[in-house]
């Protein structure tokens, strides 16, 4: 395992930094984010995700996000072969929560923007203004070929042109209830959506390529990026700096939210033993599928999310940043994340979501300087 860099010493700079946002990346697909026969094996269900998000809300997580995946990687673990649908799942979760922000993901090749605008307005009503939309262009070709809607490999180089038109239609419909947008990909003729959302609808994206960041800088409220490495919590800093620079070009403030997996235990050694156990059970067949799919896009550059996902360094959890250690060590590393300019929040996954969120809320979060404004909670959510 790659060891961490020496512990950083830093000072949290201002009040905003003292309130780094925390979100949970809910397991909408089977087995969460560990591609391993040694990891917990489970199917995605509404009841599981309901328990996760209600527990996250209890411990003052700020938001919950679900991805969309339409075809998995196979292998012994049938990784992500079993998935719920994002908008319908998050509509259900909106109805059983009261404070936490809720985000669904739109696979934009599958859903016309006017339909997404209306679905989002509906969940805004269900949630009382707590809903937002994550827009993805689509990178895994077989997801769309199986339905006969893959637009051809030229799409790889035009996908953010497509998404730019898509979000303009959304903004028209949410803002005024009407769109007459005319573009290369979409033509609206007095298209109507009513009722409109009760609050401005947040749009988020996860672009790491230059084109993706340029899109986020112009249209997104914030941008997700991958953490990097194992116990190297600030290694993503160059990515956050690129996003900050791109946003400065548009005169907007678009922060970075960073994806990490937390594997924690009483001691560093106990947590590391779990991590090594998961790696030893890596599902090589599923990982080979991921590597093969990552090579299909030859037009978007070398800095895309999927290229990082397929990197062999930590492929067992698709190369999201990984924080492995005692509760105190993980708290310290998350405070180091908060020290990075442009980092406004983190999106967390866990090897075991229910116990992971509980130990985070009771043992890790109370030790974090960047969450010191929150009360310490020990009572389990019902």
From Swiss-Prot:
Keyword S-adenosyl-L-methionine applies: no
SUPFAM superfamilies: Bacterial luciferase-like (SSF51679)
List of residues binding FMN: 68-69, 134, 143, 159-160, 209
Family annotation (Gene3D superfamilies): Luciferase-like domain
Inducing stimuli: Up-regulated by the nitrogen regulatory protein C (NtrC also called GlnG) and repressed by RutR.
GO MF entries: alkanesulfonate monooxygenase activity; uracil oxygenase activity
Catalytic activity reported: uracil + FMNH2 + NADH + O2 = (Z)-3-ureidoacrylate + FMN + NAD(+) + H2O + H(+); thymine + FMNH2 + NADH + O2 = (Z)-2-methylureidoacrylate + FMN + NAD(+) + H2O + H(+)
Pfam families: Bac_luciferase
GO BP annotations listed: alkanesulfonate catabolic process; nitrogen utilization; uracil catabolic process
Source taxon at top rank: Bacteria
Enzyme class name: oxidoreductase
InterPro entries: Luciferase-like_dom, Luciferase-like_sf, Pyrimidine_monooxygenase_RutA, SsuD_RutA_monooxygenase
EC number: 1.14.99.46
Keyword annotations from UniProtKB, A to Z: Flavoprotein, FMN, Monooxygenase, NADP, Oxidoreductase
PANTHER family registered for this protein in UniProt: ALKANESULFONATE MONOOXYGENASE, ALKANESULFONATE MONOOXYGENASE-RELATED
Role according to the record: The FMN-N(5)-oxide reacts spontaneously with NADH to produce FMN. Requires the flavin reductase RutF to regenerate FMN in vivo.
Protein family (similarity comment): Belongs to the NtaA/SnaA/DszA monooxygenase family. RutA subfamily.
Protein name: Pyrimidine monooxygenase RutA
Organism per entry: Escherichia coli O55:H7 (strain CB9615 / EPEC)
């Amino acid at each position: 395992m790659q060891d961490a860099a020496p512990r950083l010493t830093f000072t949290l700079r201002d009040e905003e930094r003292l309130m780094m946002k925390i979100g949970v990346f809910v397991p909408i697909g089977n087995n969460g984010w560990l591609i391993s026969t040694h990891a917990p094996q489970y199917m995605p269900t509404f009841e599981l995700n309901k328990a996760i998000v209600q527990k996250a809300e209890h411990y003052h997580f700020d938001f919950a996000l679900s991805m969309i995946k339409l075809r998995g990687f196979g292998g012994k673990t049938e990784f992500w072969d079993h998935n719920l649908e994002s908008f319908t799942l998050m509509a259900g979760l909106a109805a059983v929560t009261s404070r936490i922000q809720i985000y669904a993901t739109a696979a934009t090749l599958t859903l016309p923007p006017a339909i997404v605008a209306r679905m989002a307005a509906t969940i805004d009503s269900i949630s009382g203004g707590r809903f937002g939309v994550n827009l993805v262009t689509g990178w895994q070709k077989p997801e769309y070929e199986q339905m006969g809607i893959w637009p051809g490999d030229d799409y790889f180089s035009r996908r953010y042109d497509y998404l730019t038109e898509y979000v303009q239609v959304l903004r028209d419909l949410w803002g005024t209830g009407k769109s007459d947008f005319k573009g290369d990909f979409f033509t609206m003729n007095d298209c109507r959506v009513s009722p409109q959302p009760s609050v401005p609808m947040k749009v988020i994206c996860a672009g790491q390529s230059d084109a993706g960041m340029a899109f986020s800088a112009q249209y997104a409220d914030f941008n997700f990026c991958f953490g990097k490495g194992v116990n190297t919590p600030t290694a993503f800093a160059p990515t956050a700096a690129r996003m900050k620079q791109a946003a400065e070009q548009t005169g907007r403030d678009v922060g970075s939210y960073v994806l990490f997996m937390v594997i924690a235990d009483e001691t560093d050694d106990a947590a590391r033993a779990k991590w090594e156990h998961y790696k030893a059970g890596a599902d090589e067949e599923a990982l080979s599928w991921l590597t093969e799919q990552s090579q299909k896009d030859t037009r978007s550059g070398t800095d895309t999310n999927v290229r990082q996902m397929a990197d062999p360094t930590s492929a067992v959890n698709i190369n999201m940043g990984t924080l492995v250690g005692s509760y105190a060590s993980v708290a310290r590393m998350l405070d180091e994340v908060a020290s990075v300019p442009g980092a406004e929040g983190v999106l967390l996954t866990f090897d075991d979501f229910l116990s992971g969120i509980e130990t985070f809320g009771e043992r890790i979060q109370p030790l974090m300087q960047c969450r010191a404004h929150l009360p310490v909670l020990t009572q389990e959510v019902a």
